[in-house]
Amino acid sequence: MDGTLFPGDDDLAIPATEFFSTKAAKNPETKREAIVKAYGDDNEETLKQRLTNLEKKITNITTKFEQIEKCCKRNDEVLFRLENHAETLRAAMISLAKKIDVQTGRHPYE
């Protein structure tokens, strides 16, 4: 079950290396120095560019999470108001039904 993506998918084990896009992640058994020599991806500008791209992605994700949080908070407020409105309507309908019963003579006035 260590190589599975989802619990219960033991028959469809997917190695985790298929989900990584870096060259180093696809060859985890080799040493980092050998990968750097083979692919030449360890110069300083490339690392800075990769870090900048990663920072942009993280910033984008955090702003999206903030937007989701605001949306969920707004939906929670709207749902709370709707629940209160439904409870008020229920109480008004019960009161109206009692009033109609008294006026039609079904139940005596209490």
UniProtKB/Swiss-Prot annotation:
The keyword Disulfide bond applies. Keywords: Disulfide bond, Phosphoprotein, Virion. It is found in: Virion. Its main location: virion. InterPro entries: Chordopox_Fusion/A27. The keyword Ligase does not apply. One of its GO terms (biological process) is fusion of virus membrane with host plasma membrane. GO terms for cellular component: viral envelope. Pfam families: Vac_Fusion. Structural protein involved in the envelopment of mature virion (MV) to form the wrapped virion (WV). The wrapping consists of the addition of Golgi membranes to the mature virion. Participates in mature virion (MV) movement within the infected cell. May play an indirect role in MV-cell fusion. Homohexamers, covalently linked. Interacts with OPG144 and OPG153. Belongs to the orthopoxvirus OPG154 protein family. This is Protein OPG154. The gene is OPG154.
